[in-house]
């Protein structure tokens, strides 16, 4: 059985910013937590309502992943969750004074920096690294995901955007480690198509969206502050989202994840299937 020491932050750290969808200023505080706490969100503006970062608490997957407990919600958790899970942080309290996690620059970069600033310490209790007892898959229309037994966490993703010549078809495959995530995935920003913007705004989304936290793709080019961080930044960001969503399984695991055109809803659906076949 694979196992390692549980990990938490060495000290408390704080970050303030704007939520990309609701457009509200928010402050998050990451606090060290004792062994076997897990990752828990806490709405500091609502008498400390606790929301565990687990699949049963997912309540919405429209353009981001939202968790809830009782009447409390916490939205757009995936970029922070990807950073915590890729850094092997098992136990942390995330306090937020609003209903949405700040978006930063649209990537996981700010959260990786927070973890670096806080420092990481090992704890006395161990955590087992789960494996898949059998392959599982999820398919819906043009979306396909599968998870295969593997000795490491590997993600292979195909992004196909025929409606956007500037994105087209992109493919990347990474073995996910703290280093590969930090260098190859964490800097990659969320993106949208130019012709989607009105639709998103009509739905009350991207209220805090701007070129400081997103990349916009037009048929004839890219609207961005500076150049793309990678030529295939969109597919890398999709991998980032997938890591964040699958972290809601609630325990570290190894598998080879193969994804074609997945989003938050299908990522969560695969996560639920993975949870059914994890061992030990």
From Swiss-Prot:
Pathways involved: Glycolipid biosynthesis; lipid IV(A) biosynthesis; lipid IV(A) from (3R)-3-hydroxytetradecanoyl-[acyl-carrier-protein] and UDP-N-acetyl-alpha-D-glucosamine: step 2/6
Active site (record annotation): 264
GO cellular component, one term: membrane
InterPro entries: Ribosomal_Su5_D2-typ_SF (IPR020568), UDP-acyl_GlcNac_deAcase (IPR004463), UDP-acyl_GlcNac_deAcase_C (IPR011334), UDP-acyl_N-AcGlcN_deAcase_N (IPR015870)
Cofactor(s) required for function per UniProt: Zn(2+)
Binding residues for Zn(2+): 79, 237, 241
Keyword annotations of the record: Hydrolase, Lipid A biosynthesis, Lipid biosynthesis, Lipid metabolism, Metal-binding, Zinc
Catalysed conversion reaction: a UDP-3-O-[(3R)-3-hydroxyacyl]-N-acetyl-alpha-D-glucosamine + H2O = a UDP-3-O-[(3R)-3-hydroxyacyl]-alpha-D-glucosamine + acetate
Gene3D superfamilies in UniProt: lpxc deacetylase, domain 1, lpxc deacetylase, domain 2
UniProt cross-references to Pfam families, sorted A to Z: LpxC
PANTHER family: UDP-3-O-ACYL-N-ACETYLGLUCOSAMINE DEACETYLASE 1, MITOCHONDRIAL-RELATED (PTHR33694:SF1)
Role noted for this protein: Catalyzes the hydrolysis of UDP-3-O-myristoyl-N-acetylglucosamine to form UDP-3-O-myristoylglucosamine and acetate, the committed step in lipid A biosynthesis.
Family indicated by similarity: Belongs to the LpxC family.
Protein name per its UniProtKB record: UDP-3-O-acyl-N-acetylglucosamine deacetylase
Gene that specifies this protein: lpxC
